[in-house]
Amino acid sequence: MANYPAEGDVFMLTVRIATPPFKPDRSGFMEVNPGIASSYIFSLKPGDKVIMSGPYGDFHPHFDSKKEMIWVGGGAGTAPLRAQIMHMTKTLHTTDREMHYFYGARALNEVFYLDDFLGLEKEYPNFHFHLALDRPDPAADAAGVKYTPGFVHQVMLNTYLKDHEAPEDVEYYMCGPGPMSNAVVQMLDSLGVEPESIMYDNFGG
């Protein structure tokens, strides 16, 4: 779920594809049996009422803290991070904590909610958005979108944390693919960051 409470009765769901790899040598298209949830969602019509519950769990910001906050995300993992960031800014109007979001993607066309994060950066001087794309992206260059080539954990280290006075005093919030989360955790461990300062929803395993 990507929305925050102040957005009212609108629910934004960021869904990732979990189908097996496509094998074009066997057929010209992928045969996938429709799932229960996807079949239900695609059967809905405007005006239909649905019952929802959640989200559950303990992946949320420490609201009573004044520490700097760094979010790291990618793919569908940006959904809960957007909700947290929007709540900290739009709902709580937090201006006394430094906040950074390092967003990793393969290319510009895979980036969700870009306008939201760029808008927050203009509205809140204490919020900073950092986009990391795996490699130089002509589409991003043509659009004038600022980004740094490289994997997100490398970009975060090279452009910010390596010159940070006390990276161990920062709160880190992560959600994204397993390999990304693992790389970030290893990098933070090398900087002396304690596990208690790293909060994440590692849905990628």
What are the language-model segments listed below?
Residues 1-46, 105-106, 132-136:
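Ferredoxin-reductase
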Residues 98-205:
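Reductase modules of NAD(P)H-dependent flavoproteins
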Residues 1, 80-92:
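Histidine-anchored nucleotide/phosphate-binding helix
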Residues 2, 57-65:
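Short, Lys/Arg- and Gly-enriched loop/turn segments at beta-strand edges
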Residues 50-52:
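Generic structural signal for buried aliphatic residues
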Residues 69-84:
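A phosphate-binding catalytic loop at a beta-strand-loop-alpha-helix junction
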Residues 63-67, 166-168:
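Short helix-loop-beta connector
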Residues 65-67, 87-99:
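Conserved S-adenosyl-L-methionine
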